[in-house]
Amino acid sequence: MALLQISEPGLSAAPHQRRLAAGIDLGTTNSLVATVRSGQAETLPDHEGRHLLPSVVHYQQQGHTVGYAARDNAAQDTANTISSVKRMMGRSLADIQTRYPHLPYRFKASVNGLPMIDTAAGLLNPVRVSADILKALAARASESLSGELDGVVITVPAYFDDAQRQGTKDAARLAGLHVLRLLNEPTAAAIAYGLDSGKEGVIAVYDLGGGTFDISILRLSRGVFEVLATGGDSALGGDDFDHLLADYIREQAGIADRSDNRVQRELLDAAIAAKIALSDADTVRVNVAGWQGEITREQFNDLISALVKRTLLACRRALKDAGVEPQDVLEVVMVGGSTRVPLVRERVGEFFGRTPLTAIDPDKVVAIGAAIQADILVGNKPDSEMLLLDVIPLSLGLETMGGLVEKVIPRNTTIPVARAQDFTTFKDGQTAMSIHVMQGERELVQDCRSLARFALRGIPPLPAGGAHIRVTFQVDADGLLSVTAMEKSTGVEASIQVKPSYGLTDGEIASMIKDSMSFAEQDVKARMLAEQKVEAARVLESLTGALTADAALLSAAERQCIDDAAAHLSAVAQGDDVDAIEQAIKNVDKQTQEFAARRMDQSVRRALKGHSVDEV
């Protein structure tokens, strides 16, 4: 673990000066910004006291508006009013048009197939639109805190891939923001409730927003959140509750005409108001389009019951993917404004067998968790005189066949962190695997530092490549590395703990990094050679087993050709010519193709023997 001091060159750190940091929940429907003041995390309102900022931007030739003012233009100027841009982040134009065919925007493709939205302000990509939302949030924070932000933590869905995460970072950079970290939304919600410092175990985060539903199953271990499974429904949210209730009110009021947009809007507004009122009251009076009537909570529950059930089915699937049962869940965190609906809380509580956490405003909980994390990462710790950022100074990885190092966690990764990678067996019938944990930047084991060794035993004796071993590296906030190896089919596992930074000076770390740069080209060539030698050994091992089992399938001449090709491969594999080894491997493959086909036919005949066509 390295401690990096971040400060302006030539200036001493001001020990009592708090750095300004914010947490940003960049949402699909609404966004928020929060900060920590006087030890308390709070979301920041606009001049009218509104904490939510609609994630909508309206573009004109002479500028743009963000938020409520932009949303008011949605009906009149649809093509220039961009909303739900988060759905487009990191996706190709073809992907967007397939997933969301009814978007009302004029799209064009960039040279690399990425989406560009044709607006009055010109062609804009989703990154630019997101940047304008982030700028509005940053301006609100800077005004409230009376200063420029030193850093932000931005939340993203747990299922966001690398392209979507990079797009979010690019948007922040375009907005002039320094991103301390991207934080998974469910993790942020758990942090807001202080679960990161509580008991270890499984946590479920149930997130029902306006347009989407997400369920995340997390495991907390030694201060690190690991995402076990995610799921949900991208076409289910609180908006669906509103539309069902609006249709019900329409029926009760006897309104048949659906073409009047003004009446449509009036019905929807009445439905939203009724939904909110029914969270606290058993009945509510509705006055809309000349009709007056009463709606009960029971009627509302009947309308939305099937939708709530759909969310619980998604929860069940996520739990199954995570390999846990509802009773294994330690806490359930509620996120999203639609979780205020009493029926939602009741059904979720029944499903998990425990009362969900609802003390923090579900609209604000993600932003609050992000603010808490930002306050820590920017260096606002008690009694701290400088900004300390904990990072892994040298890459951590494993030795693989051929004396190679497979990096699992690259250097400069902020901690705590957990990463997993799958490996497999090299030989037929292999029942044990030696795990050699390495540290360093070079490609070969001989040039890196050995941290620890342990063995995983009890692997089922399968053909080479048949067993799958998941190796998980986990570094906690104190820099303690835990490595766990688990065979997937049996669940058998072994683990070890080590302190990677123990015994290393800053000079030694710098020297190891310098060597990795100086010998980069040489190391790549050495790795390529080692990889080809490993592949040659695997091919020869597999061929030997096949010949032992089914040599009778070959004529003497065919056997001689295969033996000659194998002997040549064995000979060149002792040398250092990468191309020669590669060509020899290809030659063995060519000479054994017919043999492989005969073995396959024989296996099929054996499998079908004694069975009728109908049985097959």
Curated annotation (Swiss-Prot):
InterPro entries cross-referenced by the UniProt entry: ATPase_NBD (IPR043129), Heat_shock_70_CS (IPR018181), HscA_NBD (IPR042039), HSP70_C_sf (IPR029048), HSP70_peptide-bd_sf (IPR029047), Hsp_70_fam (IPR013126), ISC_FeS_clus_asmbl_HscA (IPR010236)
Keyword Lipid biosynthesis: no
Pfam family, one: HSP70
Signal peptide: none
MF terms in GO: ATP binding; ATP hydrolysis activity; ATP-dependent protein folding chaperone; heat shock protein binding; protein folding chaperone; unfolded protein binding
SUPFAM superfamilies xref list: Actin-like ATPase domain, Heat shock protein 70kD (HSP70), C-terminal subdomain, Heat shock protein 70kD (HSP70), peptide-binding domain
Entry keywords, A to Z: ATP-binding, Chaperone, Nucleotide-binding
Record bears the keyword Hydrolase: no
Function description: Chaperone involved in the maturation of iron-sulfur cluster-containing proteins. Has a low intrinsic ATPase activity which is markedly stimulated by HscB. Involved in the maturation of IscU.
Similarity section: Belongs to the heat shock protein 70 family.
Name the record gives this protein: Chaperone protein HscA
The organism of origin for this protein: Salmonella typhimurium (strain LT2 / SGSC1412 / ATCC 700720)
